[in-house]
Amino acid sequence: MRSNIKLLFWFAVIQILSFHFSFTTLAEVPKNYLKGKFYTSVKDHFLVATEKMTDGRFKKAIIVMLDNDEEGAWGLVVNKPIGKVPLNLLINTSQKLKNEKKELYNVEIPIFWGGPVSKEQIYILHSKEYKNQTTESYKDFSITRDYKILFDIAENKGPQRYLIILGYSGWADGQLEGEMEVDHWILSELDSQIVFEEESKNKWPQAYENSFIRL
């Protein structure tokens, strides 16, 4: 009988301690603990605008985050199409070589708005099978800034999947963290299928549905 009472006593103690530990743990969850795991950087995630976003430019935006360090963070919006423009308008005059494939200058190419910074800078976000000397490789895709890739795309010799993006989105050190603190942004797992295959209008709902839930 006594052994049963002791057993019940220690069971009750363990339950109380477990509850206290769980409560303390949840109360002290750090800000970088999302969906059951820690993250040390927003790089290689989707940054997804929430309904609390106050900047109209980023309403229902999803951003592929490319870097996050002590100097800040930057990425490319991938669901804000601008429209189609002739290849000729995407190539800087100083880069146009004499007699280089001028027949392609009028080929129209779809482009996207990547953010309000360096709005004339072109980034080609694409699948990894395509490479040239300026290609930078990331986890699930690559980025090329060499204008010659545009000619390859116009000739159907470019990457299988791509987005041509003008400008980028950038934050100073601590700025993005402040915006996340007031729930203007939430993180979501990066998915190349959403980036390249989904229609623009469907990208935000898909990314938001897959977003991390803050504890």
Where are these regions (language model features)?
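A detector of low-complexity, intrinsically disordered, Ser/Thr/Gly/Pro/Ala-rich segments
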Residues: 3, 22-23
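A short aromatic-anchored loop/beta-hairpin motif
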Residues: 26-165, 169-215
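Bacterial N-terminal signal peptides that target proteins for export
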Residues: 2-11
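Bacterial N-terminal signal peptides
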Residues: 10-22
